[in-house]
Amino acid sequence: MSRVFSVTLILFILSFSVSASDDPVDVRHEMMEGVLDGAKAIGDMLKEKREFDAAVAMDALLVWQKASKEFGDLFPEGSYTGGEDKAKETVWTDREGFNKLLADFAREVDAAVAAEPQDLEALNAAAGPIFKVCKKCHEGYRIEGD
């Protein structure tokens, strides 16, 4: 099962290449889907709904790391959709706050990748701060819903 997850994440990472012709709304949506898949995998490990797997955890962290480096560029002026993609208008009206949380996300993810968690306790220590940043960002910059 972890091999399938790893292959899926690798394919997702390879599909991240953003070119000038890609629609930023579509790309950011796909990127968040990958981040969400990683969050589910790590969350299930932390809740002990899934056996700890260091390779799967690292794959998820690497997807998050790639997203942390590219995500900010996917919200250019004029790309607000009126909420169709769950991004609140505050992404654009409070860009400084949004960019700060993106920087916090990148810092925490980089630290987690560097830590290379090899057990559940280490994964919890590495992922906890990341999930806190995610929560803050979603509270201020994401429209809640299904």
Segments from the language model and where they lie:
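Sequence context surrounding c-type heme c attachment/ligation sites in exported
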Residues: 21-146
